[in-house]
Design a protein with these regions (language model features):
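An amphipathic, aromatic/His-enriched active-site/gating alpha helix that lines ligand/cofactor pockets
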Residues: 28-30, 54-79
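Short hydrophobic/aromatic beta-strand micro-patches
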Residues: 9, 50-52
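Short S/T/G/P-rich N-terminal loop/turn motif that feeds into the first structured element of a domain
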Residues: 1-30, 34-36, 41-45, 78-88
């Protein structure tokens, strides 16, 4: 299944409770989407999320149903892994 990087911008700082995150994860799983990782910018006004999903359209539909904005979706061809320790 392909991987997608999703960029989102928020009008206000994102501050989700654990319960809200659980609801979003469940909605994603119901749509066949696996949420791999999420990153917030320091000001909490943007997020970058990595998903495994059948298609970008499935992510768009699930995001719309959850009221989550999408700025862009990019299909990524491979995962290179994680950095074990900071360089330097």
């Amino acid at each position: 299944m392909p991987f997608f990087l999703v960029q989102r911008s928020f009008a206000e700082q994102l501050d989700l409770s654990r319960d809200e995150i659980t609801v979003l994860e469940g909605a994603n799983l119901d749509a066949g989407i696996r949420w791999i990782e999420a990153f917030l910018t320091a000001d909490r006004m943007q997020s970058y999320c990595l998903f495994e999903a059948p298609s970008a359209d499935v992510i768009r539909a699930a995001s719309a149903a959850a009221g989550m904005p999408i700025d862009s979706i990019v299909e990524v061809s491979s995962l290179l892994g994680r950095v074990a320790a900071p360089a330097g």
